């Protein structure tokens, strides 16, 4: 086992003893990697665990800075890299198998690395970090430097891999994107180039994307202006405009899940939607592979999306969530799926070994399988993961060979302590919480969430079994603790009960009783010494409200199991006075506390402050709560809440905390003598620990990192070991008899039938639970009752038996009450529905009745609240509508109807103009007035300059001036057809409106809109005034009709006609305020009348009746009513109702009448006749009056209807004017909007141009730098090549002193090179490995060079020396040859670097050209946009009024093409035609009148010809006399009306040109200065080099002279002279050519200057923008 060499020196001073990590058990949460063909590794907590798949041997590497982050391995170099999780994390690179640190990489990442990946060949490591940098970095991990990095904010990546065949390609994929990054290198410079893959749509089809920046397919609109891209319409001008797409244009794409590379540098991508994609690595072209469906599809499985992919020959291996591995056989563009392997769990990761003979399969639980090709068995489980992290651990007594672990799902494992091999497993199939092993027997207790305790027998380690189950309560078990001698088992539950159970299996784990403590139990501590017969128990609980902790202590005698009935009551509760229960409180909160073995001392770990305190218990007894004060306080030097444990002999205090450090302290001094950092604070430290009885074995369990660490002592001896070993021996001797007895009982105890499961059954059950979690298995089992409820029921039974008589009496009373209630229910059934009570009212359950009553009250209150809220919402909505549509209206909307015809006229509802609108209108009006005054002043100034004409005009007659003024006014007011509306018909002033042909600027259009809105407001106001007048007139007419109807009703009543009286009324549309008032008849609900209202109505009715009685008693009034109908004077209207009473004698026959009576009868008839005549006369007068009144009503109402019809026409015209003005406003608003879009587009193009220019400067700088580097490298290459040639040519000169034949032999040996034997790979391996031999890299080149040097050592051996050669000469020859070989290698390497740099330069040049093309394209787009903008500003949209039926077009094509069409008024054409016709008629008449017209014409033509000839003669004479030269400037001066403005413009252009030339000149001067400075430095360098060369030249001349003497002496001619002569001739020729090129360059520069001067002279106004 090896650990990291760097470990933080903690703040603890360890003494002579120290701890070390023996092994670590944990299961992978990240992907498992191969280090070599036989070793895999994975991170777990603070460690990296290496496993040999053949021997299953583990090796551990510990991270010095906490939890291991991400990890990657490099198989060729056998190194592993991982990051830590601290702030500003580091990357560590370790070699394997030595586990020595190679390097430490430090970047600028703030939080965490998320991905690491090694290149398959070379020393490159790629790292990726997410938030907040989103940075991809490339490292040279051997030299610990970052080669290049790039940040892309917002891009989250979940997989990263290098191309196995090309280290320059890197693929990054996420659920939404796939990108291929290319690494480009030039000498020592590296850079990233990213390209994104265009993914298909979800259905596998491809979407044709258009260019967002420069769209080419936009339609052309000749009427409404240019059509711009969507980004310009949206107003985007930044980078977001380059990728902007509206929501309607966004389509869901495929979601990649995994990718893998192929030997052809292609990519296979698996998607969530089930598609398999193939991407070309060079072109990034995406191909959707077609799936070939089999005839018999796979049953009971539905493979949707691959979770992981690995490449194999002719296809890929993929896995999903169904636990199967599939083989994808790919041919061309289709693939077929076949079953490859079945795994018990869903597969999360797969990878091949480097030799491709082993396939590693990792499940979601963390288990690791190895599939070996061509061997039996093919599938082998390397790592069997547990079902979740370890919840609890404990040693099996005595703690030297085995230990147990428990997971939350109920999985119990027995492990071999030496190498952590799993011996056996058992599943409880329930949620477990705690575990404890019994010191006095081979058994263990497991607490569960449902309140049960399972007792496990581990007598047979390979097959543990449940021997007993105790269902204590329905509250979960949180603590299970054995005392030191294994007498009692104490179980703490969440509800605050501590159960005491007999720990002996022979007693069937008898439950003795329980005691109640505080609910939040933190720890239970016991002390059971060998020399005493009691067990002291302490329970620690927290009081979060008070910020304190409570200690509750009680004593249990060892004889308690025999006398348990006397210690507990009938319900099982232990009596506090018998167990001597005492309460203590501490003034501060503790996270843990243990009871010391001696001196009644307690040790506590403070949770708020980093201190460990000891407390002394009082010796005297006390009642109530006793406050403990700290006796000793020591700083723990551990942060976070911690736990305390005591060793078996009670002299070691072991502390663990959130920081992950375990400390062993002396119990007396509380000082640390041993410590170990086994976990880290990133994983929330240590959850629990266990120490064996002999103190030599320590198990530490992490809280969140899922690691179990086994610690051993490095040095364990002396007094430290003797104390605990002595106590261990005594304890074993004391427990030996009890252990033998209990173990024998456990060996004979049968297994309890509890629903347990084996490994395979548990796996299947787990899988079925995962697949369908909603299925419920119903079993007909009787519900089990907890022990505490059983005791309660037994106590209740005893109480029932004790009070049986009283119970009978109560039963009889209940029976009588039930009979009474039954009678009441029968009576209730006979009542009516209103009087009936509900069935629940007769229930005797008062609590139920109260509950139902409360529910009904709550329901009523809820309904009331809902109704109130509903009413409130409706009221609020009504108030909003009223405020918006009524109160805010300055002019309320209303209608006006005619009396007789169906005609309705509505007014214009209008809101009051705001203060801002009025201020804006005032500003525009003031501006218009100022402009008018300015225009008037300008006209006066221009007229004053004209001089004489102005004086003549002032002296003209007054009539002509008035006519001209009228004409001017008439001209200034535009006609309606040019104004575009009929607003002048309403008397609205339109003189301030600008002409529609002059609205070019944005401000003019805005001002025009404001004025048009004001015109609309005025038009509406004018009409509303007319409407109000008509409304008042109708009110007057209705009042007058109502007044006349009074008389009409009287006449009808007098005439006793049945004719109805027509009474006009205002309708609701005419008086809309009625809608806001709710009438009583509109309310459909029953009106609720309050009691005091009812009482008031009764009083009013009583007073009315009393008044009527008083009126009946008045005889005078009654007499008046009987005599004259209640009136004192007879009116004329009463004639019609007047009746003359008949005499009384008329009842007699005529024969018996007397004369007097006959005379009275005649008088009667005369009166009747007169009355009838008067009645007829009055009736006729009434009828005439009635007809007259009705006619007057008819006439007045019809007159009003006619007026309203005219008002309706006025309303139509006003609406027409309003629509016309609003149409103009809409056109202006559209032009403003289009202007904004054009401005946005122009800003975006300018910003885009700025970015491209910046990019161009960067690319130009990169090209310049690359070209300089290439030149330097080429120079070095030329030097090396020249040195190589010199070494080759000067070989014979070096060995000129030896004979010629030996020189020839040595030259052949000098040219000879060793053959390097390539390692031949086996044919089987070559056929299996799909990637074959990976391409070379820098490391491989170094290895090849080292191998070449090794082979050169063999050639340099003395045995290869030719015969007769001096050994000194041989050694000199070997050194020369080795130098030649090294130089050749340098030349090859430099040639490769040169080719790479040339390629890099070519790419940079291509990028520069591409950017330049983009810039030119942007310039072209800007020019087109500016042209469009100018065209849009000039081509105005105007509104012209046309008369219907007067537009005639013979050619319909004129409507389509507006290039030559002019729209004019028809009246102008007609007037012109009439004038032409009149003049033509006059001309014909004059020609007919004059007979000699033709002669006169001929005469005039002759005279005209004569005069022309004379003019020619005179002109010729004038030309002969004087020739006058007239230049173009003078012509321009005479022809140009504003020559000074033209001159000023040209001066401005020339100034700009001069400024630009000055700027360019300064820039050229600066460049020349820089060049001169650079040349000066270069000259100094050359002087120094020339001085060095001159010195060398002297030495060489001396050597040459010596050699000449030698050669002359030997009589042989040297070839050096020939070489020197040739070099001299070449040098002279080169110098001559250099001079010629300089002269030509000077001539070219002079010609360029002349060309530039001529160009500026020809085009002086072309200034660069």
Swiss-Prot record:
WD repeats lie at residues 108-149, 152-191, 250-290, 299-338, 342-381, 385-425, 427-469, 472-511, 680-721. Keywords: Cell projection, Cilium, Cilium biogenesis/degradation, Coiled coil, Cytoplasm, Cytoskeleton, Disease variant, Flagellum, Repeat, WD repeat. One of its GO terms (biological process) is nucleus organization. SUPFAM superfamilies: WD40 repeat-like. Residues 812-869, 910-957, 1154-1207, 1378-1429 form a coiled coil. It is found in: Cell projection, Cilium, Flagellum; Cytoplasm, Cytoskeleton, Flagellum axoneme; Cytoplasm, Cytoskeleton, Cilium axoneme. It comes from the Eukaryota. InterPro entries: WD40/YVTN_repeat-like_dom_sf, WD40_repeat_dom_sf. Testis-specific. Changing residue 85 to W: In SPGF19; uncertain significance. GO terms for cellular component: 9+2 motile cilium; axoneme; extracellular region. Disulfide bonds: none annotated. Belongs to the CFAP43 family. Flagellar protein involved in sperm flagellum axoneme organization and function. Involved in the regulation of the beating frequency of motile cilia on the epithelial cells of the respiratory tract. It is linked to Spermatogenic failure 19: An infertility disorder caused by spermatogenesis defects and characterized by abnormally shaped spermatozoa in the semen of affected individuals. SPGF19 patients have spermatozoa with absent, short, coiled, bent, and/or irregular-caliber flagella, which impair sperm motility. This is Cilia- and flagella-associated protein 43. It comes from Homo sapiens (Human).
């Amino acid at each position: 086992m090896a650990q990291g060499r760097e470990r933080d020196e903690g703040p603890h001073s360890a003494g002579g003893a120290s701890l070390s990590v023996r092994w670590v058990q944990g299961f992978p949460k990240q992907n498992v990697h191969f280090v070599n063909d036989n070793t895999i590794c994975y991170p777990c907590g603070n460690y990296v665990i290496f496993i040999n798949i053949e021997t299953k041997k583990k090796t551990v590497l510990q991270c010095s800075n906490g939890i291991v982050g991400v990890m990657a391995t490099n198989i060729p170099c056998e190194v592993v890299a991982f990051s830590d999780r601290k702030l500003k994390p580091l990357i560590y690179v370790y070699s394997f198998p030595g586990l020595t640190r190679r390097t430490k990489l430090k970047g600028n990442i703030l939080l965490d690395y998320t991905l690491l990946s090694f290149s398959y060949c070379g020393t490159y490591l790629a790292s990726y970090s997410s938030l907040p940098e989103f940075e991809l970095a490339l490292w040279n991990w051997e030299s610990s430097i970052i080669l290049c990095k790039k940040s892309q904010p917002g891009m989250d990546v979940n997989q990263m891999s290098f191309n196995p065949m090309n280290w320059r390609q890197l693929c990054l994929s996420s659920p939404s994107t796939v990108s291929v990054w290319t690494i480009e290198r030039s000498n020592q410079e590296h850079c990233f180039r990213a390209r994104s893959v265009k993914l298909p749509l979800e259905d596998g089809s491809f979407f044709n994307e258009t260019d967002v920046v420069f769209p080419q397919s936009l339609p052309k609109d000749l009427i409404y202006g240019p059509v711009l891209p969507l980004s310009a319409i949206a107003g985007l001008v930044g980078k977001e405009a380059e990728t902007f797409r509206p929501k309607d244009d966004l389509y869901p794409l495929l979601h990649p899940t995994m990718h893998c590379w192929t030997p052809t540098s292609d990519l296979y991508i698996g998607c969530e939607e089930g598609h398999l994609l193939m991407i070309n690595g060079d072109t990034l072209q995406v191909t959707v592979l077609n799936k070939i469906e089999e005839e018999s599809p796979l049953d009971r499985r539905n493979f949707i999306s691959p979770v992981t992919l690995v490449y194999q020959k002719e296809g890929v291996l993929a896995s999903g969530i169904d636990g199967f591995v599939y083989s994808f056989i790919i041919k061309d563009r289709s693939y077929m799926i076949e079953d490859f392997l079945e795994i018990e769990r869903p597969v999360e990761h797969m990878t091949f070994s480097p030799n491709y003979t082993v396939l590693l399969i990792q499940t979601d639980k963390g288990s690791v399988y190895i599939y070996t090709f061509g061997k039996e068995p093919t599938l082998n489980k390397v790592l069997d993961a547990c079902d979740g992290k370890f919840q609890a651990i404990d040693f099996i007594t005595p703690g030297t060979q085995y230990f147990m672990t428990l997971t939350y799902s109920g999985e119990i494992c027995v492990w071999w302590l030496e190498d952590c091999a799993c011996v056996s497993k058992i599943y409880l199939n329930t949620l477990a919480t705690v575990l404890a092993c019994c010191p006095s027997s081979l058994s263990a207790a497991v607490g569960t969430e449902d309140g049960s305790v399972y007792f496990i027998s581990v007598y047979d380690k390979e097959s543990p079994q449940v021997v007993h189950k105790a269902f204590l309560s329905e509250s979960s078990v949180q603590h299970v603790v054995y005392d030191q001698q294994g007498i009692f088992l104490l179980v703490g539950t969440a509800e605050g009960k501590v159960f005491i159970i007999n720990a002996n299996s022979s007693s069937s784990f008898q439950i003795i009783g329980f005691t109640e403590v505080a609910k939040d139990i933190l720890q239970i501590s016991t002390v059971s010494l060998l020399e005493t017969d009691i067990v002291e128990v302490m329970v620690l609980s927290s009081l979060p409200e008070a910020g304190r902790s409570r200690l509750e202590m009680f004593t249990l005698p060892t004889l308690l199991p025999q006398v348990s009935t006397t210690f507990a009551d009938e319900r099982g509760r232990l009596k506090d006075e018998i167990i001597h229960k005492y309460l203590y409180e501490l003034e501060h909160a503790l996270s843990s506390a243990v009871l010391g073995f001696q001196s009644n001392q307690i040790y506590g770990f403070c949770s708020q402050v980093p201190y460990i305190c000891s407390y002394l218990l009082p010796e005297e007894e006390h009642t109530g709560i006793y406050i403990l004060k700290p006796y000793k306080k020591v700083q723990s030097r551990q942060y976070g809440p911690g736990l305390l444990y005591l060793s078996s002999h009670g002299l070691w205090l072991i502390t663990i905390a959130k920081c992950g450090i375990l400390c062993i302290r002396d119990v007396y001094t509380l000082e640390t003598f041993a410590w170990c950092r086994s976990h880290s604070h990133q994983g929330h430290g240590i959850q629990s620990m266990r120490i064996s009885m002999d103190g030599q074995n320590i198990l530490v369990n992490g809280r969140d990192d899922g690691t179990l660490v086994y610690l051993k002592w490095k040095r364990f001896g002396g007094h430290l070991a003797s104390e605990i070993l002595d106590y261990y021996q005594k304890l074993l001797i004391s427990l030996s008899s009890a252990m033998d007895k209990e173990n024998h009982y456990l060996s004979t105890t049968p297994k309890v039938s509890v629903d347990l499961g084996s490994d395979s059954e548990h796996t299947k059950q787990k899988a079925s639970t995962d697949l369908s979690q909603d299925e419920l298995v119903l079993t007909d089992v009787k519900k089990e009752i907890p022990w505490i409820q059983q005791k309660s029921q037994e106590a209740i039974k005893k109480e029932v038996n004790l009070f049986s008589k009283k119970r009978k009496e109560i039963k009889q009373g209940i029976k009588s009450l039930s009979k009474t209630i039954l009678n009441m229910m029968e009576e209730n059934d006979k009542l009516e529905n209103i009087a009936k009570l509900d069935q629940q009212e007769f229930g005797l359950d008062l609590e139920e009745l109260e509950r139902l009553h409360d529910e009904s009250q709550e329901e009523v209150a809820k309904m009331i609240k809902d109704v109130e809220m509903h009413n409130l919402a409706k009221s609020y909505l009504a108030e909003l509508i009223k405020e918006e549509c009524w109160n805010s209206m300055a002019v309320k909307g209303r209608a006006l109807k005619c009396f007789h015809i169906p005609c309705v006229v509505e007014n214009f509802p209008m809101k009051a103009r705001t203060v801002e609108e009025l201020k804006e209108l005032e500003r525009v009006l003031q501006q218009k007035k100022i402009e008018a005054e300015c225009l008037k002043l300008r006209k006066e100034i221009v007229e004053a300059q004209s001089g004489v004409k102005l004086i003549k005009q002032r002296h003209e007659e007054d009539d002509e001036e008035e006519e001209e003024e009228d004409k001017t006014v008439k001209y200034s007011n535009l006609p309606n057809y040019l104004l575009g509306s009929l607003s002048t018909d309403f008397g609205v002033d339109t003189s301030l409106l600008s002409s529609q042909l002059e609205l070019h600027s944005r401000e003019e259009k805005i001002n025009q809109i404001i004025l048009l809105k004001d015109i609309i407001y005025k038009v509406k106001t004018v009409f509303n005034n007319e409407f109000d007048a008509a409304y008042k007139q109708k009110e007057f007419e209705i009042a007058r009709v109502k007044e006349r109807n009074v008389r009409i009703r009287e006449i009808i009543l007098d005439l006793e006609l049945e004719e109805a009286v027509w009474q006009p009324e205002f309708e609701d549309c005419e008086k809309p305020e009625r809608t806001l008032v709710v009438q009583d008849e509109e309310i459909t609900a029953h009106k609720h009348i309050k009691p005091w209202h009812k009482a008031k109505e009764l009083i009013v009715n009583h007073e009315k009746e009393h008044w009527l009685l008083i009126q009946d008693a008045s005889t005078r009034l009654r007499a008046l009513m009987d005599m004259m109908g209640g009136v004192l004077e007879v009116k004329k209207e009463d004639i019609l109702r007047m009746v003359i009473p008949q005499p009384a004698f008329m009842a007699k026959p005529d024969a018996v009448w007397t004369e007097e009576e006959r005379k009275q009868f005649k008088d009667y008839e005369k009166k009747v006749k007169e009355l009838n005549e008067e009645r007829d006369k009055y009736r006729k007068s009434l009828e005439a009056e009635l007809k007259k009144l009705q006619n007057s009503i008819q006439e007045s109402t019809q007159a009003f209807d006619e007026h309203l019809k005219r008002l309706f026409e006025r309303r139509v015209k006003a609406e027409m004017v309003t629509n016309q003005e609003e149409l103009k406003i809409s056109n202006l608003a559209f032009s403003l909007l289009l202007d904004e879009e054009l401005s946005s587009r122009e800003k975006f193009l300018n910003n885009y141009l700025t970015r491209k220019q910046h990019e161009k400067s960067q690319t130009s700088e990169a090209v310049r730098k690359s070209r300089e580097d290439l030149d330097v490298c080429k120079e070095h290459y030329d030097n090396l090549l020249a040195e190589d040639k010199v070494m080759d040519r000067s070989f014979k000169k070096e060995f000129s002193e030896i004979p010629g034949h030996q020189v020839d032999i040595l030259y052949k040996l000098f040219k000879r090179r060793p053959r390097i034997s390539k390692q031949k790979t086996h044919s089987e391996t070559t056929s299996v490995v799909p990637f074959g031999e990976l391409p070379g890299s820098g490391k491989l080149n170094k290895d090849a060079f080292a191998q070449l040097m090794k082979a050169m050592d063999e050639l340099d051996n003395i045995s290869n020396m030719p015969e007769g050669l001096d050994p000194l000469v041989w050694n000199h020859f070997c050194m020369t040859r080795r130098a030649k070989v090294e130089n050749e290698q340098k030349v090859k390497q430099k040639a490769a670097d040169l080719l790479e740099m040339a390629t890099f330069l070519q790419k940079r040049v291509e990028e520069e050209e591409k950017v330049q093309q983009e810039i030119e394209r942007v310039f072209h787009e800007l020019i087109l946009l500016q042209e469009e903008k100018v065209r849009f500003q000039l081509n105005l949209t105007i509104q012209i009024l046309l008369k219907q039926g007067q537009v005639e077009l013979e050619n319909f094509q004129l409507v389509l093409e507006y290039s030559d069409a002019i729209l004019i008024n028809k009246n102008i054409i007609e007037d012109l035609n009439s004038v032409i016709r009149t003049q033509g008629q006059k001309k014909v008449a004059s020609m007919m009148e004059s007979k000699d017209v033709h002669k006169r014409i001929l005469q005039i033509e002759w005279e005209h010809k004569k005069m022309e000839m004379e003019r020619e003669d005179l002109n010729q004479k004038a030309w002969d006399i004087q020739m006058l030269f007239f230049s173009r400037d003078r012509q321009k001066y005479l022809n140009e009306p504003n020559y000074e403005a033209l001159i000023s413009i040209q001066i401005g252009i020339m100034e700009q040109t001069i400024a630009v030339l000055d700027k360019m000149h300064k820039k050229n001067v600066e460049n020349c200065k820089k060049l001169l400075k650079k040349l000066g430095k270069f000259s100094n360098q050359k002087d120094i080099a020339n001085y060095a060369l001159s010195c060398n030249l002297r030495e060489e001349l001396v050597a040459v002279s010596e050699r000449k003497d030698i050669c002359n002496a030997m009589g042989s001619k040297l070839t050096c002279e020939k070489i020197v002569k040739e070099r001299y001739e070449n040098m002279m020729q080169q110098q001559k050519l250099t001079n010629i090129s300089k002269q030509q360059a000077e001539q070219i520069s002079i010609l360029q200057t002349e060309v530039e001067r001529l160009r500026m002279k020809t085009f002086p106004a072309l200034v660069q923008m």
